[in-house]
Amino acid sequence: VQGGDWGATISKWMAELYPDHCIGIHLNMIIAWPPVDKDPLENTSQEEQKLMANYEKYKEQGVGYYEIQKTKPQTLGYGLNDSPVGLAAWIVEKFYGWFDGEENKLVVSNDEVLAIVSLYWFSESITSSTRLYKENGDLGFSFENIKQPMAGAVFERDLIAPPRAWAEEIYNVVQWNTHKGGHFAALEQPESLSADIIDFIKKLNIV
């Protein structure tokens, strides 16, 4: 399985719940926290500590959307589902802030942005997508160890970029690479992401 953002959480659940059917897990947003009984900076490099600073900035300036979607998704949904401009503003703001681009500059085309906004608008699915934060967020994150091989593709400007030592507390890490790019890796750096996935598949000897 492969995933980033919510896909990373879902991928972990799949690996945990269906170990006989999931032979490997590749993540491009690795969710991991420091071990409670160790120095959180133990076995971390200076470069990894620098990447961790992105998360601190995100916590200070970027989690407003998360708190709203986690606590009042239905209220938010009425407004976004009623206004294409409001919906576009809610989504496009993330594209500006979460890509590895210069300030106030998109790194994907307007056509790609409009296609994504249109997906939510014409299907009227923005409300159900925000409810995901409420309905699944209440469950919390599972810290059960994953025995299947795991590959981490860390993109330097992602919202969460924990050090490998943290990930190894939960996952069976067999591959760990750092790439240029931000949160939406598949849009921004498709070549880097796909090459990382292919390298992992080769390690699993399934092709």
Where do the model's predicted regions map?
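Generic detector of intrinsically disordered, low-complexity, polar/charged segments
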Residues: 1-4, 21, 61, 76, ...
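Conserved hydrolase catalytic core segment
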Residues: 1-50
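Extended alpha-helical regions
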Residues: 11, 28, 55, 61-62, ...
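The feature captures the conserved acid-bearing segment of alpha/beta-hydrolase catalytic domains
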Residues: 41-72, 142-145, 168
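C-terminal subdomain of alpha/beta-hydrolase-fold enzymes, centered on the catalytic histidine
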Residues: 69-207
